[in-house]
């Protein structure tokens, strides 16, 4: 099984909007890297290619689920502005959906976010409020909360870090997709954590299918990391949806190690992903190296095109 996908490739009809294409992303078998890193040939490594979502990241799933939930509960009504804090990808997803559905969007974003992310937000028509780099995503969270508290009638505030609709998007979407795409053969699930929605929802669903599946949570290895979108939970504002008891294994990824794997994925597997995807594959490889047989599945949250201005691509190593 080289590539598995349940995305429909039929002819789109006029009423098929952009949000209808969210989810059902391909599951790619990682080529070459497992052999290079000494993984037993009886161990299979796969990754969900989340840049196939319309705005280019896994966050399309949670953004759509939170917006649909807000509409059902009467929290998002005509004329309201969608407001949230983001390291970039959720903001881009909210901006895309807002543009498609006629809502204004404001995103509080750390000033360290890549220029590509800021530009994408602007192209979708979002108003970007930059927050201090020293506070990382925590500063963006505090600013979004302050703005909402000042004028709650003006905003729909999904609050992705504390909204159960975030992880439910993966419980009802990503988890079942992985189970179907692997024919239930998955033995290990590996995911990085930021809001923790992808990890929490997917892990809970996979455990429901098979309690013996090992779930691996990946955080940055220290507070002063360079992995956009990921949280070092011991030193950050912990999301309300984060479940510290869910992981069977918890791993800390170093920034340089994750960046090295990000480069290696491009050079040896033809996969251009972002640094958080590099962290996920770094952890997946480390898990796979300990196994005699099995199937390890991870999630690549976004593509590498929104990080092309980052200097880590220029490293002269020879992974």
Map each language-model feature to its residues.
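PLP-dependent amino-acid enzyme catalytic core
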Residues: 1-319
């Amino acid at each position: 099984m080289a590539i598995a996908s349940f995305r429909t490739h039929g002819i789109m009809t006029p009423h098929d909007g952009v949000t209808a294409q969210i989810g059902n992303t391909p599951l790619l078998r990682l080529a070459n890297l497992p052999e290079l890193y000494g993984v037993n040939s009886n161990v299979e490594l796969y990754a969900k290619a989340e840049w196939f979502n319309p705005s280019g990241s896994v966050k399309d799933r949670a953004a759509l689920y939170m917006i649909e939930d807000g509409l059902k509960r009467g929290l998002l009504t005509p004329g309201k502005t969608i407001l949230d804090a983001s390291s970039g990808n959720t903001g881009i997803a909210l901006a895309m959906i807002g543009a498609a559905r006629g809502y204004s969007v404001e995103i509080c974003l750390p000033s360290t976010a890549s220029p590509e992310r800021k530009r994408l937000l602007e192209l979708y028509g979002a108003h970007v409020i930059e927050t201090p780099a020293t506070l990382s995503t925590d500063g963006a969270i505090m600013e979004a909360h302050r703005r909402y508290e000042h004028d709650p009638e003006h905003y729909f505030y999904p609050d992705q870090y504390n909204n159960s609709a975030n992880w439910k998007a993966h419980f009802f979407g990503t988890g079942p997709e992985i189970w179907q795409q692997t024919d239930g053969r998955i033995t290990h699930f590996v995911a990085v954590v930021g809001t923790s929605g992808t990890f929490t929802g997917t892990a809970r669903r996979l455990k429901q299918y098979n309690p013996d599946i090992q779930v691996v949570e990946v955080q940055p290895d220290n507070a002063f990391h360079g992995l956009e979108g990921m949280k070092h939970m011991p030193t950050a504002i912990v999301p309300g949806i984060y479940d510290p008891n869910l992981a069977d294994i918890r791993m800390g990824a170093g920034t340089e190690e994750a960046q090295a794997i990000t480069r290696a994925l491009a050079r040896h597997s033809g996969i251009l992903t972002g640094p958080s995807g590099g962290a996920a594959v770094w952890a997946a490889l480390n898990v796979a190296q300990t196994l005699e047989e099995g199937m390890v599945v991870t999630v690549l949250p976004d593509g590498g095109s929104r990080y092309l201005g980052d200097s880590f691509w220029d490293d002269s190593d020879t992974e």
